[in-house]
Regions:
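Peripheral docking tails and interdomain loops at the edges
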Residues: 2-69, 184-187, 198-203
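Active-site cofactor/cluster-binding pocket
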Residues: 1-2, 6-11, 72-82, 86-203
Length: 203
């Protein structure tokens, strides 16, 4: 920060206002809504975005999520288990779409600290227009969960747009779904017109 201030002070940009901020802490994603929050709080010379900073209390409140992907872009998110093949399959899928169709394609892969057995998230976008959204997907048209235990740990279904599709890999029949699916998941599926499918991919 001090190096930047010193460099600008001795240039034609000496009257440019400079802010000091922290982002990406703990490998947190930086979203368009957080960037807008920075511009909306230019009276503050220091800030933190992406986390609740209870040490310096410099966190900025962010508004509703902002979607910058072109209209007609399909957003997909896949929740997998480290080394279960989900990431590899999605890398192949997005390459096939990019190489063999007239669509633009983009993929990001998010992991926790464990190499094997940890949570993996694959974020895939594809569509007819160029995609310049350099952040992870927070509202998806399609969400797939490849590990049934995740439905009790993560808010996956809530990441879907109204009318989106949720695919769950599980061995449960209707009775099992009634027993294992959390109440808030059932309520969200019903209230937001989510198309829900199951597949037993481990059978």
């Amino acid at each position: 920060y001090l190096d930047v201030v010193a460099a600008l002070r001795e240039s034609k940009f000496s009257d440019v206002k400079i802010f000091s901020g922290r982002y990406g802490l703990g490998s947190k994603d930086t979203t368009p809504a957080q960037i807008v929050a920075v511009y909306n709080n230019t009276e503050k010379e220091k800030f933190t975005i992406g986390i609740v900073d209870d040490v310096t209390n410099l966190s900025l409140e962010t508004g509703d999520a902002i979607v910058t992907t072109p209209e007609g872009t399909t957003n997909c998110k896949f929740w997998g288990l480290g080394a279960d093949g989900t990431v590899g399959a999605n890398k192949n899928s997005i390459k096939i779409i990019g190489d063999n169709t007239d669509m633009y394609a983009q993929a990001y892969f998010d992991y926790d600290s464990k190499k094997s057995g940890g949570v993996t998230m694959s974020h895939l976008r594809f569509g007819k227009e160029p995609i310049k959204s350099t952040y992870l997907i927070h509202k998806a048209d399609f969400v797939a969960c490849h590990n049934p235990s995740y439905v009790n740990k993560y808010n996956m279904v809530q990441e879907l747009v109204d009318g989106g599709t949720f695919l769950l890999n599980c061995p449960w029949d209707m009775e099992g779904l009634e027993k294992h699916l959390p109440g808030q998941v059932k309520a969200f599926i019903a209230n937001h017109n989510i198309k829900f499918y199951t597949i037993d991919g481990v059978k």
